[in-house]
């Protein structure tokens, strides 16, 4: 029999309640929206607080109580009255808790964030399904750009980003997963730059993500719009680096190790690779694990089946141009499944 969303959420809830019991935590309060949505199984945009005692309670504002009762019927819904009520007897909080809330806590407490982070790093079947859908949506936008490059060359960056975000919205994205990076020319030499009213020219970098039912995608493509040998050389080096990473991406490799492998592949160009190789994706577009050579030994993570990560090598030539190619992957025991499937241009 197919599991309902309530069955899936109850499994997550039971795992967290067992953790609380093992740690001697009697009452945990969760305020971070992404952590709440993890236990809800759906995107809930309104104010809410999730409280775990012997069972979980979702506190919402008066305006949202009817909606919450209809959509989250596997939880008891309560109307928010006061922070004193929420935190009374609380002994488990997130590390992100603002200092202003501490005045409501009258006993020693433990940090629960590491457990939630550990749970969220390994995606279950329902999460993978939603991430795949988000990736499918951003693929549609990337493929539109690829198939309409002649038209794109006549647009400004503002006009193109509007078209891209419209396509994603039309196909079910709640919102962009982050501020869309749609830039051309010298601005591509900055890993993170915002679109402007400039006309698209020479080289185009598109880094976008969709959000479907709260779950994110992340994909980058670079398009060469003129015949330039240096651009081709750098582009193909980045493309090959991505393939090198794919050869090593599987359960058992460490986050730091796979970054270092790509950095060494770049050889004389590795100083131009100025960011980490990738990051986890789920309810947040940037979450654990980080694939970075800067991780300390106690921060390094062994990749496991069920993790969803990006691989995004890039090289950036100051005052000239930059190239980045990024895809989204589900880690498996003996390899991976590529979740983003938009075509990659070859030059």
From Swiss-Prot:
Which annotated residues bind Mn(2+) 1?
Answer: 218, 279, 312, 326
**GO MF entries:** metal ion binding; metalloaminopeptidase activity
Q: Which GO terms describe its biological process?
A: proteolysis
Cofactor(s), names only, from the UniProt record: Mn(2+)
Record keywords = Hydrolase, Manganese, Metal-binding
Say yes or no: keyword tRNA processing present.
no
The record's annotation in InterPro entries points to:
Creatin/AminoP/Spt16_N, Creatinase/aminopeptidase-like, Creatinase_N, Pept_M24, Pept_M24_MAP, Peptidase_M24B, Peptidase_M24B_aminopep-P_CS
Key word Hydrolase present: yes
Q: How is the cofactor bound?
A: Binds 2 manganese ions per subunit.
Enzyme Commission number(s): 3.4.-.-
Q: Write down the top EC class of this protein.
A: hydrolase
Binding positions for Mn(2+) 2 per the UniProt entry: 207, 218, 326
Q: Name one Pfam family in it.
A: Creatinase_N
Q: Which protein family is it in? A: Belongs to the peptidase M24B family.
Under what name is this protein listed?
Answer: Uncharacterized peptidase MJ0806
Species per Swiss-Prot/TrEMBL record = Methanocaldococcus jannaschii (strain ATCC 43067 / DSM 2661 / JAL-1 / JCM 10045 / NBRC 100440) (Methanococcus jannaschii)
